[in-house]
Amino acid sequence: ANKELDDLKLKDHYNYNVYQKLTLALNNITADSLRESKLFKQYPFFREQVEYCADIDKNILPLSVDETLTQVVYRKKPESEKHIIKGINSTGVNELFNTGDMLTTVLKDVFQNVNVYEDRVRLLQYPFDSPISDNGIGFYRYYIMDTTYVDKDKCFQLSFVPNNPQDFGFTGTLYILADSTYRLKQCLLNLPKKTDVNFVENMIIHQQFGALPSGEWVQTTDDMLCELNFFGGHFMVRRSTHNSDYSFLETPERVFKKKGKEIKDANAMMRNDEFWSRYRATELTKSESNMGGFVNKLADIKGFKYILFGLKALIENFVET
């Protein structure tokens, strides 16, 4: 594959929007648990919150959903980059206790950005060879599977696995443009379970790339899904990221005079439905949309404060690991 993403930092100015959705859910809700669990029998609204996740072929029960819209702005001379948080929308069980923000921070740390264009990728505190790196040629074995279309682009479909089955590396599929550029159009990466990454059972990474009207080749989609198991609880976390609205026009000077790299807009927490309908790149599922009602019913349960105490302890233990 062509190993070059167009380096936007060669431009004098650029800005673009990053929409991100982070969902935390109970995982692996089986037919037996739906039928036999006292929780689902006693509180039908829990059953109503369960939905199917096609990516892992399991039923899940979403507990919280966090959305952010961030504008990334860059100036070459003098060099400066700012992340302006335009919108924040958070609903779910993390609203009910102080640890919620801490959990979101930890999950975002677990879900670090993976840049496959770098030779070495660091994920879950481990280094991995990228499947399109110079080292990858020796580490992975590649198989040409098919010629297919991604969006409207004709691509070669390549599967890859570590050369040595004992080695800890990605498995997955690359989609390379079937033209003279050989650019990476899409990649699907799977991270197999490793015993000493004690809480991660499975991780799936999906990235997509495309050309801007002005010709630059940029990342448009960066999605990650992780199945976790800690203290006997099965959880799924999904992060959906979409980059859009690229512009190379000059950003007003006043933006770069603000202190700190991350700047929160004064109205970020007060955005209305119209705002989110405009910028939401990944639609909310039925259960995610119903999160507010789910939390209200949860808070009405008799003895809920004891359940909350247990949830808080579980999350604090996870944060410490």
Which sequence ranges carry the predicted segments?
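Structured extracytoplasmic
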Residues: 1-157, 161-169, 227-320
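Transmembrane beta-strand segments that form the barrel wall of outer-membrane beta-barrel proteins
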Residues: 187-193, 319-321
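Outer-membrane beta-barrel proteins
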Residues: 192-202, 206-209
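Extended lipid/amphipathic-ligand handling interfaces
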Residues: 173-178, 204-213
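Cysteine/selenocysteine-centered motifs that mediate thiol-based redox chemistry or coordinate metal-sulfur cofactors
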Residues: 208-231
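Short, hydrophobic/aromatic-rich segments at coil-to-beta transitions
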Residues: 13, 151-159, 183-188, 216-221
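Short conserved beta-strand segments at catalytic cores or DNA/RNA-binding microdomains
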Residues: 159-162, 173-182
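Short helix-loop boundary/capping segments
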Residues: 166, 179-180, 188-191
